[in-house]
Amino acid sequence: GKLTLAIEMFKGTYDRSFFHQLISSQLDMDRMDYLNRDSFYTGVAEGNIGAERIIKMLHVVDNQLVVEEKGLLSVENFLVARRLMYWQVYLHKTSICSETMVLKIFERVKDLLKQNIYVDIPKHLAVFFNRNISKEDFQNENMLLQNFVSLDDVDIWYAIKNWQNHNDTVLANLSQNITNRNLFKIKLEVGLKTEGLEANILQNFEAKKIPKSFQK
């Protein structure tokens, strides 16, 4: 059916291979979409890649996706923009700290539930805290997948705001801090640990079969 066809395109087993390149490649539609979207919402101009021009420059030759020569500069700008967005947005210290705090909040909720301590959780979110779910569970239980795709930022923030007033101090403090943007701090470790460093370097040289004349 249609779902089988979509899966074949995504995995690259469909005979028209350019569909896979459009869906999942270094120059796919998803990357163009999220770069423009995230550039708009974060105000980072470097992510504005001119996706419409790139799409107009795309063609299919021998079942492969190709780019017109005059579109190469736009593709180069796309690759540079993606790298800049990772450093300025996705790997920014604020993003990393926020993500870590959300994970710690969820870990704390699971710990409390294991101790039979009540935590108010929205129904379609609770299923992910009450049991350990594997990839196979998603494949075998349609209800799990439906619950997952129904979640959005509003559900997560609603739960976190409720947990600000929980009796557990750890959960309450974490929830209050992320709500009030009092985020974790990144601590940089100064100084290079050199113990065993030379031995590791030599071992890597040997593994890559680099001649000894180049090792010093």
Task: Specify the residue positions occupied by each region the protein language model found.
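Histidine-centered, transition-metal-coordinating active-site segments
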Residues: 1-216
